[in-house]
Design a protein with these regions (language model features):
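Conserved helicase motor core of SF1/SF2 NTP-dependent helicases
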Residues: 205, 214-218, 222, 226-242, ...
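Extended, charged low-complexity regulatory segments
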Residues: 1-156, 160, 164-165, 393, ...
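P-loop NTPase Walker
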Residues: 102, 108-115, 120, 124-254, ...
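Alpha-helical nucleic-acid-binding subdomain
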Residues: 194-404, 408-420, 426, 435
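Phosphate/oxyanion-binding active-site loops and adjacent basic polyanion-contact surfaces
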Residues: 151, 155, 185-189, 370-377, ...
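A structural signal for short, well-ordered beta-strand segments and their strand-loop junctions
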Residues: 39-41, 114, 176, 430, ...
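Short, hydrophobic/proline-enriched secondary-structure or compact coil segments at domain edges
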Residues: 36-42, 375-382, 531
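Generic alpha-helical structural element
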Residues: 7, 144, 148, 209, ...
C-alpha cells in the first residue's frame, strides 16, 4: 500500500471548494443525516457551475443540491466521467455540457472528512491536515480472460461418464438428477430427452419440459433448438396447468388473481390440504351437473371449518393463513364492478384510462378470479370423486417423456398432477436441488416424498458432483452460505469473488456504474446480472444504475440471453447463468439468518460463471460467514 502524500495546490483548492459547499449543504438541510453525497462541477452554456448530490433538491444562494436519484442534471454524474461530455433529456429539454470534476464525499457530523476523485482518495486527519492515497474502493468487476470468452453452451459440452450413464438409461426408467448448482442437471435432463427422441425413431412421439419460471422456459426452448429436438412442449407449470384446467373445467373464470395473500398461497400448496381433500371429495358436488367445479372451491376455501382442519394438521400453516384464505375467497366470488352495473350499461362507458378493470388496485381487485393454485386442487378433487364412482377422471395430456426442471419448487398436488401426465410406459426425468428451494410456499419435504407424489417411487437417482459452471472458490463460498459448517474459501484480491462496501446508495450506484462502464469496454461480450433480493429492489437498482449505463430490467422471464447488463431478482434466475453476477444488497436486511435467506443467496451467487461481486450499504449479511470482509479490512477487501 502506498504511503499517503500531501496535496498539491490544485487539489487543496478543490478540497476547500467542496468543503465550503458541504458546510452550506449542512445549513440548507440541518435535519438530514447526510446532506450531500457527491460533488459535480460542469461547464454548460459558457458557465461553470458547482452542484452537490444529496437526498433532496434544494436551490439557494450558497449551494444547489440535486436529488441524486431523480434530478435530471444529477444524471451527468453517473453518465459521464471527468473530462467527458454529457447530454441528457429533461422533459422536452436537452441538458448538455462537460463534466469538469466529480467526486464522492464522506461526511462525519456534517463535516467533510474525505472525498474520492479520479482514482484518488483525499482524507483529513484529526489535526485537519489532508493527504492523498489511491482509491481502493472500486467495483471489483474484471474482464474474462480470452480463453473464457467463447464457452460452449450447456448442451454442447462433452458429458462426463456419470452424466452419460444417466442419459443412457433405458426408456421408461424414471430418473432423478440431483446435485448442487452448476453440475449439469439441466444438461443431463435435456440430453436424455434428446437421446430418447433419437431412439424412438419415426412415429408419433410427444414430450414436455415443465419449469417454474418464464426465464428458464425461454432458455430451455433455446437449448432444445440447439440440440435439434423439435415438437417439445416447454411451459411453466402455471401456464401448463391453466391450459389443462380450462379444457377440463368449463366454469373457471377468465382472470387469475393478482393479489392472493402469501398465507393463502401457502395453505393451498401445503400437503395438509391434500390430506383433507379425500374427506371433502366424499361430499356431494356443489353442482349436481358437474363432478367438480368452481362452486366446490367456494365450499372448500370459503368454509372456515375446512380450513381449520388444514391448520390442525400442521404447524406450518396458521390460523392467520386460514383467515386470509377465507377473506380472499369471499372477494373472488363477488361480482366485478362492471358486472354489477348489469347488461343495460354500455361496457365502453366503463372502460378505464389505463385499460385495467375498475376494481384493479382496490381490495376487490380479485373479484371473479381463480388462483393458479386452484387448478391442481380441482384435478385432485375430480380424481378422488371419479375413483369413488368408478369413473374415468379428467386427465391431463399424456406425454412419452416428461422433464421437470427445478422441481423442488413444485407443491405436492402439483407433482401428483404432473405425474399423471406421463403416458403408460413413458419416461419421467426430474432434476432439482433442495439447496435452491426459494419459494417458501412450495412445501418441499424431501426427494423420496416428491417422487412418490409423482407416482415414481421406483426410480434411479443420480447425484452429480462436479461443478462445471462456477470457479471452485465460488462453489466453496456458495456451500459455506448454504451450510456454515462447510469451510469458507480463502479469497484473495485477484480471485473470482469481490466485495464492495459503500456508505450509501448514491456511492454504491456511482461505484457500480463506473465499474460496469469499464467492463463494457474491456469485455463487451460479457453478460452481467445484477441480482437483487426482490423484484421491487431490482426495479430500484435498474433505475439508479440506468442513470449511468444501459441496464435492462428483466422480470417475468424477460431475459436477453447475450451480452449486456440486466437487473433482476433471485426468484427469476433459477437455472440461468451469467458471466458476472452482482449481488447489490448483500446486507443483513436483505438476507437475514435462516434457511430461506441462505437458499436465496446460494441461488444468486451460483449464477456466476466467471465472477461474483457482493455489495452492500449496510452490515454484510451474516450468511457470508467467514468469507465477509471484517470491518477493519473492509477498504482493503473492496478491491
Amino acid at each position: 500500500m502506498q504511503t499517503p502524500r500531501p496535496l498539491d495546490a490544485e487539489e487543496l483548492a478543490y478540497v476547500a471548494d467542496v468543503a465550503r459547499l458541504a458546510e452550506a449543504a449542512r445549513a440548507a438541510l440541518p435535519q438530514a443525516a447526510t446532506p450531500c453525497h457527491a460533488h459535480l462541477r460542469v461547464r454548460a452554456e459558457g458557465r461553470t457551475r458547482d452542484y452537490l448530490l444529496g437526498p433532496q433538491t434544494v436551490t439557494g444562494d450558497e449551494v444547489t443540491i440535486l436529488r441524486w436519484d431523480q434530478a435530471p442534471l444529477a444524471g451527468a454524474f453517473f453518465a459521464s466521467v471527468e473530462g467527458g461530455d454529457y447530454e441528457l433529456r429533461a422533459g422536452d429539454r436537452t441538458l448538455s455540457g462537460a463534466v469538469l470534476a466529480r467526486s464522492l464525499l464522506t461526511l462525519a457530523r456534517g463535516e467533510l472528512v474525505a472525498l474520492t476523485r479520479n482514482g484518488v482518495r483525499y482524507a483529513r486527519d484529526a489535526n485537519g491536515a489532508w493527504s492523498a492515497s489511491p482509491d481502493l474502493d472500486v467495483a471489483p468487476l474484471r474482464p474474462r480472460p480470452d480463453a473464457r470468452r467463447r464457452p460452449p453452451s450447456a448442451v454442447e459440452v462433452t458429458l462426463d461418464a456419470e452424466q452419460q450413464r444417466a442419459v443412457d438409461l433405458p426408456a421408461g426408467a424414471a430418473l432423478l438428477v440431483l446435485g448442487e448448482a452448476g453440475v449439469g442437471k439441466t444438461t443431463v435432463a435435456l440430453r436424455r430427452l434428446a437421446a430418447l427422441r433419437e431412439r424412438h425413431g419415426d412415429g408419433p412421439w410427444s414430450a414436455a419440459v415443465i419449469v417454474p419460471t418464464e426465464g428458464l422456459r425461454r432458455l430451455t426452448e433455446a437449448l432444445l433448438e440447439r440440440l435439434g429436438v423439435e415438437g417439445v412442449e416447454v411451459a411453466t407449470y402455471d401456464r401448463w396447468a391453466a391450459k389443462l384446467a380450462r379444457r377440463a373445467f368449463h366454469d373457471i373464470p377468465v382472470r387469475e388473481s393478482e393479489d392472493a395473500p402469501p398465507g393463502a398461497i401457502r395453505l393451498k400448496r401445503h400437503r395438509a390440504l391434500a390430506e383433507v381433500l379425500p374427506a371433502f371429495a366424499a361430499l356431494p358436488p356443489a353442482d349436481p351437473k358437474r363432478r367438480v367445479g368452481r362452486r366446490d372451491l367456494h365450499h372448500l376455501f370459503g368454509d372456515r371449518a375446512w380450513m381449520d382442519k388444514v391448520v390442525a394438521r400442521t404447524d406450518e400453516v396458521t390460523a392467520h393463513d386460514a383467515a386470509r384464505v377465507h377473506d380472499h375467497t369471499r372477494v373472488q366470488y363477488m361480482e366485478t364492478t362492471e358486472d354489477s352495473f348489469g347488461a343495460g350499461v354500455d361496457r365502453g362507458r366503463l372502460a378505464t384510462a389505463d385499460g385495467r378493470s375498475i376494481d384493479a388496485g382496490t381490495r376487490y381487485g380479485d373479484a371473479k378470479t381463480v388462483d393458479v393454485e386452484d387448478y391442481a386442487v380441482l384435478f385432485e378433487i375430480d380424481r378422488l370423486r371419479a375413483k369413488a364412482r368408478g369413473e374415468r377422471p379428467a386427465m391431463p395430456r399424456r406425454y412419452d417423456v416428461v422433464v421437470l426442471d427445478e422441481s423442488q419448487e413444485l407443491a405436492p398436488l402439483e407433482l401428483r398432477l404432473l405425474g399423471r401426465a406421463v403416458a403408460p410406459g413413458g419416461t419421467l426425468v426430474v432434476a432439482g436441488d433442495a439447496g435452491q428451494q426459494v419459494d417458501a410456499t412450495a412445501c418441499f419435504t424431501d426427494w423420496e416424498t416428491s417422487m412418490r407424489d409423482l407416482g415414481a417411487a421406483r426410480h434411479t437417482r443420480v447425484t452429480l458432483a462436479t461443478s462445471y459452471r462456477c470457479h471452485p472458490d465460488v462453489t466453496a463460498l456458495a456451500r459455506h452460505v448454504l451450510d456454515p459448517a462447510s469451510p469458507a474459501p480463502a479469497l484473495g484480491p485477484d480471485g473470482p469473488v469481490g466485495f464492495l462496501a459503500c456508505e450509501g446508495e448514491c456511492h454504491l450506484a456511482a461505484r457500480l456504474t463506473d465499474g460496469l462502464r469499464e467492463l463494457a469496454v474491456d469485455d463487451p461480450r460479457a453478460s452481467v446480472a445484477v441480482i437483487a433480493r426482490t423484484s421491487e429492489s431490482a426495479r430500484r437498482f435498474a433505475a439508479v444504475l440506468g442513470r449511468g449505463v444501459d441496464v435492462r430490467l428483466a422480470l417475468d422471464g424477460d431475459f436477453q440471453f447475450g451480452p449486456g447488463v440486466q437487473a433482476t431478482s433471485v426468484r427469476e434466475v433459477k437455472g440461468l447463468e451469467f458471466d458476472h453476477v452482482v449481488v447489490p444488497d448483500a446486507s443483513s436486511a436483505a438476507y437475514p439468518e435462516g434457511g430461506e435467506g441462505r437458499r436465496a443467496l446460494y441461488v444468486a451467487v451460483t449464477r456466476a460463471s466467471h465472477r461474483a461481486v457482493f455489495a452492500t450499504t449496510g452490515r454484510w449479511t451474516a450468511l457470508l460467514g467467514d468469507a465477509a470482509p471484517r470491518a477493519s479490512d473492509q477498504r482493503a477487501s473492496s478491491v
